[in-house]
């Protein structure tokens, strides 16, 4: 978390990355890109069953929610990794610290909330096959709580993501469902290279439904606050 916070504090201009990405509107661009991709993927037809992949559950309702400016987090622009997770970190052999970060293909200038929700997704996507027996946060002694992660990030980064987490969590789940829908589409066309593609494809709907449940939770909270 501290490494992520330090990364987000880097001024793009100070390292020659002022043209690395647009300084604002990150989530708007993500919504546009992923909704377009999802619509295309939904049209893929299985070569054997002739059944289309189909639209994600509550797709248009979810898009409308994320596109609603009154529900979106305050716009921010920092360097973002795009796939920040433990798998993409190199740790020191004997010391508890990160010494390298891998896989920068999706890096850009964007909203720091996206990286935070990506890294901490196992805390809120339990029940969608996103967690493993080896990592059950809040259950296995010694593993930090998400509140601890927020505190470590806030102390170094100077920004508290807590108010925006429900929205960010919902968006991450929706984004992930579209990525899995892509696996499903490639499997339907028998173009998927992974032997586990069919199993991954089965997770598309559960993740889309998980996103929708989180969207409804945010909507209910905002109704109670009189913002919707």
Q: Would you name each region that the model predicts?
A:
Residues 93-97:
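Active-site beta-strand-loop-beta-strand hairpin of nuclease catalytic cores
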Residues 79-81, 86:
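Catalytic-loop of the protein kinase fold
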Residues 114-157, 172-190:
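Active-site activation/catalytic loop segments of kinase-like enzymes and analogous catalytic loops
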Residues 1-58, 64, 70-78, 106-110, ...:
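A cross-family kinase active-site recognition segment
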Residues 89-91:
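Hydrophobic residue at the +6 position relative to the catalytic HRD Asp in the kinase catalytic loop
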Residues 100-103:
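Pre-DFG segment of protein kinase catalytic domains
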Residues 182, 186-228:
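Regulatory N- and C-terminal appendages and interdomain linkers associated
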């Amino acid at each position: 978390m501290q490494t992520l916070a330090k990364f987000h504090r880097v001024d793009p201009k100070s390292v020659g990355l002022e043209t690395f990405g647009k300084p604002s509107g990150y989530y708007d661009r993500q919504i546009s890109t992923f909704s377009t991709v999802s619509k295309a993927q939904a049209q893929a037809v299985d070569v054997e069953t002739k059944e289309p992949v189909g639209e994600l559950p509550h797709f248009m309702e979810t898009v409308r929610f994320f596109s609603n400016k009154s529900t979106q987090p305050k716009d921010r622009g920092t360097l973002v990794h795009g796939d920040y997770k433990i798998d993409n970190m190199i740790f020191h052999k004997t010391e508890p610290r990160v010494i390298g970060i891998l896989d920068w293909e999706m890096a850009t200038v964007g909203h720091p909330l996206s990286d935070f929700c990506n890294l901490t997704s196992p805390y809120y996507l339990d029940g969608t096959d996103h967690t493993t027996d080896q990592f059950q946060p809040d259950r296995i002694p010694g593993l930090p709580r998400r509140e601890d992660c927020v505190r470590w990030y806030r102390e170094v980064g100077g920004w508290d993501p807590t108010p925006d987490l429900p929205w960010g969590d919902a968006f991450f789940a929706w984004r992930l469902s579209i990525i899995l829908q892509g696996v499903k589409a490639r499997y339907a066309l028998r173009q998927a290279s992974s032997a586990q593609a069919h199993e991954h494809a089965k997770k598309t709907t559960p993740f889309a439904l998980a996103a929708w449940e989180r969207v409804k939770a945010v909507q209910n909270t905002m109704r109670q606050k009189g913002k919707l």
